[in-house]
């Protein structure tokens, strides 16, 4: 599936911020751009039709995901495809660079942890 231009541009911003964390590599997951730590994906461009264009999928536990969606539903959401997966979908245009950095840090810690609680 070809990425939309907005998704590529948004991921360039994500990559610029996210690669500042220790051990981060740029790769792909399911053919889309992703950031990984220790070989584990912590964020990617979601391609399932339940994800809106210009979104980012970030791994985190279910509790934190639900808190974010409740606090800022115009920024964070989930789709049917992602409901049972420990991640949140974020509308990149709604995030400042500081918010994006904090969000990526959450995903980075989640993926890097040896044991994950969900």
What residue ranges belong to the model's regions?
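Charge-dense, helix-prone N-terminal extensions
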Residues: 1-118
């Amino acid at each position: 599936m070809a990425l939309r231009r907005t998704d590529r541009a948004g991921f360039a911003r994500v990559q610029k911020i996210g690669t500042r964390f220790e051990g981060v590599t740029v790769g792909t997951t399911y053919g889309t751009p992703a950031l990984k730590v220790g070989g584990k994906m912590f964020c990617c461009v979601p391609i399932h039709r339940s994800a809106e264009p210009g979104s980012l999928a970030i791994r985190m536990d279910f509790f934190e995901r639900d808190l974010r969606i409740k606090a800022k539903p115009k920024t964070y959401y989930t789709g049917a495809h992602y409901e049972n997966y420990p991640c949140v979908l974020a509308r990149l245009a709604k995030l400042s660079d500081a918010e994006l950095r904090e969000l990526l840090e959450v995903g980075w810690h989640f993926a890097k942890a040896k044991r994950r609680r969900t």
